[in-house]
UniProtKB/Swiss-Prot annotation:
The lineage of its organism: Bacteria, Pseudomonadati, Pseudomonadota, Gammaproteobacteria, Enterobacterales. One of its GO terms (biological process) is adhesion of symbiont to host. GO terms for molecular function: carbohydrate binding. Residues 23-199 are annotated as: Receptor-binding lectin domain. It comes from the Bacteria. This is F17g-G fimbrial adhesin.
Amino acid sequence: MTNFYKVCLAVFILVCCNISHAAVSFIGSTENDVGPSQGSYSSTHAMDNLPFVYNTGYNIGYQNANVWRISGGFCVGLDGKVDLPVVGSLDGQSIYGLTEEVGLLIWMGDTNYSRGTAMSGNSWENVFSGWCVGNYVSTQGLSVHVRPVILKRNSSAQYSVQKTSIGSIRMRPYNGSSAGSVQTTVNFSLNPFTLNDTVTSCRLLTPSAVNVSLAAISAGQLPSSGDEVVAGTTSLKLQCDAGVTVWATLTDATTPSNRSDILTLTGASTATGVGLRIYKNTDSTPLKFGPDSPVKGNENQWQLSTGTETSPSVRLYVKYVNTGEGINPGTVNGISTFTFSYQ
């Protein structure tokens, strides 16, 4: 009987000592700085190539592989949240505002920058799906990295950004794991930095105001609706910095909301039933009118040159067009403005 109790006691002790419990402890810092102190970054881009993302050649960020110590089957993922205002988007990713001129793209995630999640909006989102540690001790880390973005059209300038709170990452236990009273959230601030921003553009060589004398014609030269006759021609010439692609938009000065391809005649015109169309070079399709804006992707914006041309030019042809309302002879006047976008 005595030996039986000794055997049972030995087995009980063996089973007891193999039992392990999921555990977590915080070994990081609750406040963390992103990027080097007083960083300085320089880049050159076309004036209207906006938003322009600075590619510094290295990550402006913070990473730490040892923020939480975990063991015994503990399961952990990560959520992230950005507190800065959303001022735009790029390829589905939010651009967050720092100043009127400078914004940020932000990634959050596990320790490796390459696995970071592109952040959008201001809600908590899953930035690392997670894993479960085995019956051993390991750590869970995190990372944050950013890229500065130029937001507005401007001349070459230097922009200084002060230290700014970005947002937070929190540890997310799952699969029955619990953090208890352990610190789960860490915060991030972007260190102050300077952007040395150099922009490239073009200079207009032709006068900024161009008067095109329209030829006199007879109504018989435009017998049917849609018929056209060349009325006049002119050219625009520019001198550009290397690498600049020029785009242009025509705007109807009399009716700025006009998005058609027929220019509205001014109130000084006395002819009716006739309009004006503008063609470039040898194109067979007339140009349409758009908003007076240099923004990339502006409605009815068209490409004037490629980035390899430093002295681009365009030949413009103005044509009378029968609008189908019955032509009454008289004077014809129209005003169109040109807005160049340097991309």
